[in-house]
């Protein structure tokens, strides 16, 4: 009986490690896809900002580029969300992760509605979207998914050192990419509009660049 009990215990421990490893693989894939999606959505933010600032209507090349960015970014995002739903189903007690998942999905719905307004503006120059509205909407969406990515590693049983290293590195890379993207998006709008940067926007750009430079220094 003792041998049987020992064997059962070893088997149970092995199963537990297998489940933890599976969740780790899923969390890593989800995080990688969310990072990829964030980079593509940041490019969408910049291209859209440039066209919103332009005086003329957006031509077919711009609209084609924008459509491709949306398709690519959303493909990565949807794949990540499917993984997130599986992680959430496996951890029904993790309210924070479930809440972050719901917030990410809601923010996508808001972004989708904003894109419809953007499309109308790009074709008709109807002034349907203000630059600030667009930047805020897509930035909130990107940030919501960054939060989901961070919390994904709470839903797996890992050594604390590994989790923290993984999380910190990914977060630093995201901070660099996101603030550089905000810098590019703001510049793109004013270049497209052929308008000088207002003093407050120049201060914003300096702030974005400061965050990027500081984050790079912490990684070196």
Each model region followed by its residue ranges:
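Hydrophobic alpha-helical segments
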Residues: 1-220
């Amino acid at each position: 009986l003792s041998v049987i009990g020992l064997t059962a215990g070893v088997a149970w421990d092995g199963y537990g490690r297998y489940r933890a490893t599976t969740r780790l693989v899923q969390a890593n894939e989800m995080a990688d896809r969310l990072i990829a999606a964030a980079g593509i959505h940041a490019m969408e933010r910049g291209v859209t900002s440039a066209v919103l600032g332009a005086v003329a209507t957006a031509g077919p090349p711009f609209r084609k580029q924008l459509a491709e960015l949306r398709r690519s970014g959303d493909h990565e995002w949807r794949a990540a969300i499917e993984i997130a739903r599986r992680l959430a189903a496996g951890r029904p007690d993790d309210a924070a992760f479930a809440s972050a998942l719901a917030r990410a999905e809601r923010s996508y719905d808001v972004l989708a509605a904003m894109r419809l307004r953007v499309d109308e503006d790009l074709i008709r120059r109807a002034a349907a979207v203000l630059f600030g509205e667009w930047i805020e909407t897509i930035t909130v969406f990107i940030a919501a998914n960054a939060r989901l990515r961070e919390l994904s590693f709470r839903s797996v049983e890992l050594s604390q050192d590994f989790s923290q290293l993984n999380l910190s590195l990914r977060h630093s890379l995201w901070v660099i990419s996101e603030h550089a993207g905000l810098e590019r998006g703001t510049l793109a709008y004013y270049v497209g509009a052929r308008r000088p940067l207002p003093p407050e926007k120049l201060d914003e750009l300096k702030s974005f660049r400061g965050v990027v430079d500081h984050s790079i220094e912490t990684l070196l």
